[in-house]
């Protein structure tokens, strides 16, 4: 209750400290609890408004039956806790969906180019949080390629090797 009443005080904290605390949340065994707490208290809207915009965003689409924020939490939950780059990539992987929404005549939605858009959007966010250039580049590359293996066949060894070299 005290956090909700004073959530705007987060603006008085240095961005480096906010970055460090976000990283601590992301590498815990249950980062979704921390991110949900940030969302529920209003802090997420201040420190990561781009992620907060995904809360409640539920276009009709074939891939997800929940809002994009909860889908993002599920992706984060299924990544390794000792890999900050992967956790950051999971956090931002669908941030491009807000700018790429297209609707089909039947009402269903899709997001052409959302991976590329997300890779672009994440860079200034991570820069704002004072992440180093190597982290920003690695996260952006993973987001850009996060749909590469979304195929209806088993990728060849060569395709997997090329993806790993790019990422």
Q: What kind of region is each of these model predictions?
A:
Residues 57-66, 70-77, 131-167:
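Histidine/acidic-rich helix-loop-helix segments that form or flank divalent-metal centers
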Residues 1-87, 91, 95-113, 117-133:
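Glycine- and charge-enriched loop/helix tracts that form the active or gating conduit
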């Amino acid at each position: 209750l005290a956090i909700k009443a004073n959530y705007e005080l987060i603006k008085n904290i240095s961005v480096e400290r906010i970055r460090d605390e976000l990283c601590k949340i992301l590498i815990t065994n249950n980062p979704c609890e921390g991110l949900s707490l940030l969302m529920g208290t209003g802090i997420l809207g201040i420190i990561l408004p781009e992620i907060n915009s995904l809360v409640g965003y539920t276009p009709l689409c074939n891939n997800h039956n929940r809002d994009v924020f909860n889908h993002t939490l599920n992706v984060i939950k299924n990544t390794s806790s000792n890999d900050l780059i992967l956790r950051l990539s999971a956090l931002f992987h669908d941030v491009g969906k807000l700018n790429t929404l297209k609707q089909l005549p039947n009402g269903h939605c899709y997001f052409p180019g959302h991976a590329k858009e997300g890779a672009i959007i994440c860079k200034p966010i991570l820069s704002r949080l004072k992440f180093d250039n190597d982290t920003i580049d690695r996260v952006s590359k993973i987001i850009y390629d996060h749909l590469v293996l979304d195929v209806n066949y088993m990728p060849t060894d060569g395709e997997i090797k090329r993806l790993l070299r790019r990422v």
